[in-house]
């Protein structure tokens, strides 16, 4: 396994499908995350031209990409440490990439928080993709499902078998397409919502009342009236509430907390 745990996509047909999933004319710039050996870049660069930038953590791969694609803006950095607003200060951005398995969800959450996100086409381990797209009540439905679906519309582009990569990983992958929703445009509101949902799922085997009480460090006598005010049964499990339910419930808790501060 390479130093940075990369698995490189070698299926040219899949690279073409990913590269053409979005129309460059709809965006101010495209950002490829982790181009590696450049298999996907070969299809992206002719389409995006000067509008394409790439972020690569591996200095050796960075040098290789620079040599293979003269004129391409490539940033040798860990994507998770980049200040996206500063590095890409203008233009609606599309993010494309075969993400490292171990930090794919952190990268996704960072992308969804970008103020000028236009869309994203990203590769995940299939198990993670199932968690992202899981429906209410599904075994895979949890914090990640709500956090991502509250901020974006998601579509499955393709399932990708392990044999499409080098070295061959032990798991299959899936490519998802994300289009941002405007529900959590405010950064402070988004962080509060994500924190609220994380607390709700902190004890997913317990009732919503118990899980929120423990997660928020609030007495049940404070939590129960707020759950009921939102129109929900406190005995429900966290996985029984939909994304829209969580948006509604978190808003009620926000108003409840604001009311307490005003007293």
Regions found by a protein language model. Give the residues of each.
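Catalytic cores of RNA-modifying enzymes
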Residues: 1-195, 221, 239, 243, ...
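Long, well-ordered amphipathic alpha-helical subdomains in the mid-to-C-terminal portions
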Residues: 171, 178, 188-230
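Short linear loop/turn motifs
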Residues: 226-231, 237-244
């Amino acid at each position: 396994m390479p130093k940075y745990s990369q698995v490189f996509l070698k299926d040219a047909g899949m690279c073409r499908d990913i590269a053409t999933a979005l129309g460059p004319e709809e965006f101010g710039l495209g950002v490829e995350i982790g181009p590696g050996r450049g298999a996907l870049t070969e299809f992206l660069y002719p389409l995006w031209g000067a509008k394409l930038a790439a972020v690569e953590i591996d200095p050796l791969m960075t040098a290789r990409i620079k040599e293979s694609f003269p004129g391409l803006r490539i940033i040798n950095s860990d994507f998770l440490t980049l200040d996206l607003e500063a590095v890409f200060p203008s233009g609606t951005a599309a993010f494309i990439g075969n993400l490292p398995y171990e930090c794919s969800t952190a990268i996704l959450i960072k992308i969804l928080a970008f103020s000028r996100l236009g869309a994203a086409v990203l590769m995940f381990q299939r198990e993670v993709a199932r968690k992202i797209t899981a429906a209410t009540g599904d075994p895979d439905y949890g914090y990640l499902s709500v956090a991502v679906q509250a901020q974006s519309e998601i579509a499955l582009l393709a399932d990708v078998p392990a044999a499409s990569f080098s070295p061959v990983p032990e798991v299959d992958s899936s490519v998802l397409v994300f289009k941002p929703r405007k529900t959590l445009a405010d950064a402070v509101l988004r962080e509060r919502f994500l924190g609220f949902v994380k607390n709700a799922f902190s004890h997913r085997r317990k009732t919503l009342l118990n899980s929120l009480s423990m997660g928020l460090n609030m007495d049940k006598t404070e939590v129960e009236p707020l759950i009921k005010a939102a129109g929900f049964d406190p005995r429900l499990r966290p996985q029984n509430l939909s994304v829209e339910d969580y948006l509604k419930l978190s808003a009620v808790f926000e108003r409840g907390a604001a009311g307490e501060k005003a007293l």
